[in-house]
């Protein structure tokens, strides 16, 4: 094993903030800057650990995306796309509205992930963190769910093709990772695992537990849909019941982890009822899985998370902290960070690493929800183990 001069690489550049549909859009990459500055102000991230993203090439994008789609994104970048084309490629609504240089800014997000893949595979670092990425809804030929290019799927395919790696994608975002799933639905070199709020009530409406892959890919797609208002104990129980059997059986060479933090009860777009407790625990458990099964090789992405002031910075900080084996934080946030950003925030900034829970609503049906979730999780774990025999 090669020696790692710095075990963990953290992708950041102000260029990543340019991925912005419009000023009122809920997907706001300012959350990445808030997180990075929080880590720096708390002396938890060293400038030497920061790496710059490159721009992914067209050939790299087309590991997953169709040629005509990539060309359409280029045209949209310069405002020269017809209404019919925009509709065909999912660029005709507020969700995925066109913006200047969208191809370059989207390809930079992909390039950040590929930069980490090369660093890890060359032995220069052990693991990496790309919180500006995690665009799991983008389809091979269509934009979807705030996502233009699917950096996770491209990275998985890149690792499989260039380095002959078996790749496991673990997605804990509140929304089902549909674009990633469909990219590998008939593939047995990449396994996708997604635990999410049921699609009965939430975009994109997919991710049913019966979606299990097809042909040689059967059994390489695992979905764990949870009931609305699921709380910490149930989420973590179902996650641990179902994810480790997948890792143990598939035997990946590397893990790609999607850390959407929209399972938090303060997130405005979802209906789960988790706290920072879950969001702190999840990446540490994924890190344990990587240490136990992939010799520590893991790339952790961002994902959803739309309360950018009170939730995302603290939660995403712990994604990075899990990689560098730092403990979960407690106590006061750096005053320097609070004093800078309180003038920009639309709400009162948190003062501590912990949730105050002063506005947390306990759900009367907690027991019923938890029992239903556990029953499904046990069924999924049993099914999965039966497919591997």
From Swiss-Prot:
The keyword Methyltransferase does not apply. One of its GO terms (molecular function) is histone deacetylase activity. Pathway: Ketone degradation; acetoin degradation. InterPro entries: AcuC, HDAC_PDAC, His_deacetylse, His_deacetylse_dom, His_deacetylse_dom_sf, Ureohydrolase_dom_sf. SUPFAM superfamilies: Arginase/deacetylase. It comes from the Bacteria. Pfam families: Hist_deacetyl. Gene3D superfamilies: Histone deacetylase domain (3.40.800.20). The keyword Transcription does not apply. One of its GO terms (biological process) is acetoin catabolic process. Signal peptide: none annotated. Keywords: Acetoin catabolism. Role in growth on acetoin or butanediol. Involved in the breakdown of these compounds used as a carbon source. Belongs to the histone deacetylase family. This is Acetoin utilization protein AcuC. It comes from Staphylococcus aureus (strain MSSA476).
């Amino acid at each position: 094993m090669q020696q790692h001069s710095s075990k963990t690489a953290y992708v950041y550049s102000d260029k990543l903030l340019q991925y912005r549909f419009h000023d009122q859009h809920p997907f706001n990459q300012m959350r990445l800057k808030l997180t990075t500055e929080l880590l720096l102000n708390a002396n938890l991230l060293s400038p030497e650990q920061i790496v710059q993203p490159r721009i992914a090439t067209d050939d790299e994008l087309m590991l997953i995306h169709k040629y005509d789609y990539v060309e359409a994104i280029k045209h949209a970048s310069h405002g020269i796309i017809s209404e019919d084309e925009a509709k065909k490629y999912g660029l005709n609504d507020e969700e995925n509205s066109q913006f200047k240089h969208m191809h370059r800014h989207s390809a930079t997000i992909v390039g950040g992930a590929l930069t980490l893949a090369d660093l890890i595979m060359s032995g220069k670092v052990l693991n990496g963190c790309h919180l500006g990425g995690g665009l799991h809804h983008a389809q091979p030929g269509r934009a979807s769910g705030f996502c233009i290019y699917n950096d996770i799927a491209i990275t998985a395919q890149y690792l499989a093709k260039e380095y002959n790696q078996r790749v496991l994608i673990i997605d804990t975002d509140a929304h089902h990772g549909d674009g990633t799933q469909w990219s590998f639905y008939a593939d047995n070199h990449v396994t996708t695992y997604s635990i999410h709020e049921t699609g009965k009530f939430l975009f994109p409406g997919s991710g049913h537990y019966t979606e299990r892959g097809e042909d040689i890919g059967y059994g390489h797609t695992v979905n764990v849909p949870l009931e609305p208002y699921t709380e910490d104990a149930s989420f973590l129980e179902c996650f641990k019941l179902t994810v480790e059997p997948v890792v143990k059986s598939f035997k990946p060479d590397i893990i790609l982890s999607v850390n959407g933090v929209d399972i938090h009860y303060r997130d405005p777009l979802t209906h789960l009822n988790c706290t920072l407790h879950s969001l702190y625990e999840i990446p540490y458990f994924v890190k344990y899985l990587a240490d136990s099964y992939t010799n520590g090789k893991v790339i952790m992405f961002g994902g959803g998370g739309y309360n950018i002031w009170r939730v995302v910075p603290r939660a995403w900080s712990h994604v990075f902290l899990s990689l560098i084996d730092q403990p979960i934080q407690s106590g006061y946030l750096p005053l320097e960070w609070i004093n800078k950003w309180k003038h920009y925030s639309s709400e009162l900034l948190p003062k501590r690493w912990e949730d105050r829970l002063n506005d947390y609503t306990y759900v009367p049906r907690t027991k019923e929800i938890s029992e239903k979730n556990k029953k499904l999780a046990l069924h999924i774990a049993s099914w999965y183990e039966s497919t591997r025999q």
